[in-house]
Amino acid sequence: MEKEAAKRRVEQLHALINKYNYEYHTLDDPSVPDSEYDKLMKELIALEEEHPDLKTPDSPSQRVGGAVLDAFQKVQHKTPMLSLGNAFNEEDLRDFDRRVRQAVGDVEYNVEFKIDGLAVSLRYENGVFVRGATRGDGTTGEDITENLKTIRNIPLRMKRDLSIEVRGEAFMPKRSFELLNKARIERDEEPFANPRNAAAGSLRQLDPKIAAKRNLDIFVYSIAELDEMGVETQSQGLDFLDELGFKTNHERKKCSTIEEVIEIVEELKTKRADLPYEIDGIVIKVDSLDQQEELGFTAKSPRWAIAYKFPAEEVVTTLLDIELSVGRTGAVTPTAILEPVKVAGTTVQRASLHNEDLIKEKDIRLLDKVVVKKAGDIIPEVVNVLVEQRTGKEKEFNMPKECPECGSELVRIEGEVALRCINPECPAQIREGLIHFVSRNAMNIDGLGERVITQLFREDLVHNVADLYKLTREQLINLERMGEKSTDNLLNSIEKSKKNSLERLLFGLGIRFIGAKAAKTLAMHFETLDKLKKATKEELIEVDEIGDKMADALVTYFEKEEILKLLDELEELGVNTVYKGPKKAAAEASDSYFAGKTIVLTGKLSEMSRNDAKAEIEALGGKITGSVSKKTDLVIAGEAAGSKLAKAEDLNIEVWDEARLISELKK
């Protein structure tokens, strides 16, 4: 076939295959038999092989799986992919409703299924799917584009040429899971514990052809730029996603009172067992986007949504032993070793016992019959003992007086429940501290997980965090399961971590009571490690959210000579000790136009993102709110501004366009 004719036919085939694909996988209403679909796909692949330049990224042929990858690249999300706060009972839902109504008044809620899968983001440029990523830590995920292309419900080209980031939950249907596990058992392979693990494992395959065989599915539930799309509610946003050709879950309801929400939750709960996919709860969202913006976010989750989690499944098994582990702060934690038992779809052999007091309070003994559940359907825990089933063979358990790792005396610090090893040279504490230092929310050194750290420690190659930056290629390549490529990738990752902003280093150091949020607050305030090291307790407690306990821990930490020596060594090795994030509002912000003003952003900005505009205005002393009122000083209106612009005009509030905003920001 000649080139022009081939081009026209390829375009026709794209349109036909995409249409049939949408009918079959999204509408569940096919208009042609499978044989016709297969014939068209075969013709398209043949034409693309004959004319390789006609193969485009949005071609339906690209769903079969591309080349094998060496590793997953990191991807920065346009806006954070936060997790949701949890509700476990009716009272939790009522508390959520009270908080929402106190903040914004009357509301409507959108109630949706919480799909039990893997949260993903889908990036489209001019209507074409260009990148897909996992949630990761909420800010940065992993690029799994080629694997996501194998999910036939993800349109490779939308029905409109928009540039947006769509959020959804990829999952494995129950039937696909059963067939996959049946095939794995027949091949003498370990079956997956549950559909969620199977979906996550499939999407993290370096070979997309494996993912293509797994018959994954997806429901999408939001657009990162939803408020720029001219829609005003979450429910309108879902309808808009339907119009664009995405698959949304139609098991959703709107309601205006918490009583209605609770009724709907109970109704939807009864459908769980009969669904063709797994759900692990119900999501309740404030429907109005204006009210969502007004409610805002905590560090971890939106204030305008909550996930009702189903009551955990409980089972009975035998407690065989109690194992002790020493954490990075020296706390000794007991863990129950159980006779293997299935709980919520996974085999459980270990469960948390938290501390000595809990063991005594519940009178837990070795060989007891115990009730086990998964807290929040994730972490197994021992609920209680079936005392009536005791046979007399059970044995009492007593916590040791010495550290199980180093033999030092264990102490209980006043006001705490945990027994602690206070030996700073305890090998378990050092090892756990190293694992924490390289973790995702700390220095984020990809490829340097628990297994490699344990090997390095066992081979006497690392004794503290500074030693990680002295590792050589020769040392790493000799470790188990470390080839040339993985060694080079790890060295690159270690080198890259030197450029991290100060808050990651602070969190990674594992200072008592200093979590990721406090580390960010301290880094923003003091801006350099040198200033923080010299801060007095009085200066520390002046910082927002830093209390006496944190201040004391920081002063004690930075008084230690060995710590100061370690920090100096890290600096000499090239590790950054300066805050690189957005600066707190500078003193000169008081001279800016925005200082002290209440400002509303609405519509789509073309020269900068809404998040960037918000950050810059706040850095100059402005306060961004989600709704227009008499207290609003300024409305900045982009394209498709909608009701907020109309309300601003009604109230005679000053309105700027994007050009005026950029002009003011440049001053």
From Swiss-Prot:
Residues 589-667 form the BRCT domain. It comes from the Bacteria. The keyword Cytoplasm does not apply. NAD(+) binds at D34, S35, E36, Y37, D38, S83, L84, E112, R135, E169, K285, K309. One of its GO terms (biological process) is DNA replication. It holds the Pfam family BRCT. Its EC number is 6.5.1.2. The active site is at K114. InterPro entries: BRCT_dom (IPR001357), BRCT_dom_sf (IPR036420), DisA/LigA_HHH (IPR041663), DNA_ligase (IPR001679), DNA_ligase_AS (IPR018239), DNA_ligase_CS (IPR033136), DNAligase_adenylation (IPR013839), DNAligase_N (IPR013840). HAMAP family: DNA_ligase_A. This is DNA ligase. It comes from Bacillus licheniformis (strain ATCC 14580 / DSM 13 / JCM 2505 / CCUG 7422 / NBRC 12200 / NCIMB 9375 / NCTC 10341 / NRRL NRS-1264 / Gibson 46). The lineage of its organism: Bacteria, Bacillati, Bacillota, Bacilli, Bacillales. The gene is ligA.
